[in-house]
């Protein structure tokens, strides 16, 4: 049975992220780990790439979770990569059509249904995260030199 027929019968597509298989579930707006279904990656937590056709996020390979870069990140994570995956139409055009009440074939001319894809991985040293961490370290050093800033930042 071909992939499109399987999808129309309700079999959800999968994508490989750093060697981990994820089920694409657009109805719930998430990628669900095939081996550990409680490990979910929410599409809402991902950033749209500049081209508007992909999502970007940092992925912790060990914990199988999205890694959030924040102002308190002062060390570079060791088991993480920058991940790029297609947007919803690239992941599951049939699922997108169903989400909006359209026929299953609605998006297939521009977005053919394909075999499960593989995420594009970029090492952290080429992701911009090291520079972000260095900037956070500098801010932390400035805060340590000015105790008022520490108190100000920590107050509710």
Model-assigned labels for residue ranges:
Residues 16-34, 56-63, 69, 79, ...:
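Extracellular/lumenal glycan-associated surfaces
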Residues 72-73:
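OB-fold/S1-family single-stranded nucleic acid-binding modules
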């Amino acid at each position: 049975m071909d992939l499109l027929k399987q999808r129309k019968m309700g079999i959800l597509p999968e994508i490989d992220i750093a060697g981990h298989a994820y089920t694409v579930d657009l109805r719930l707006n998430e990628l669900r780990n095939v081996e550990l279904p409680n490990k979910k990656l929410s599409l809402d937590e991902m950033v749209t790439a500049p081209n508007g056709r992909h999502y970007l996020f940092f992925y912790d390979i060990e914990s199988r979770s999205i890694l959030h870069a924040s102002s308190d990140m002062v060390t570079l994570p060791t088991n993480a990569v920058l991940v790029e995956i297609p947007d919803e139409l690239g992941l599951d055009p049939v699922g997108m059509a169903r989400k909006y009440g359209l026929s299953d074939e609605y998006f297939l001319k521009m977005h053919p249904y394909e075999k499960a894809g593989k995420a594009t991985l970029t090492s952290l040293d080429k992701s911009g995260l090291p520079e972000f961490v260095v900037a956070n370290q500098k801010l932390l050093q400035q805060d340590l030199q000015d105790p008022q800033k520490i108190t100000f930042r920590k107050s509710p």
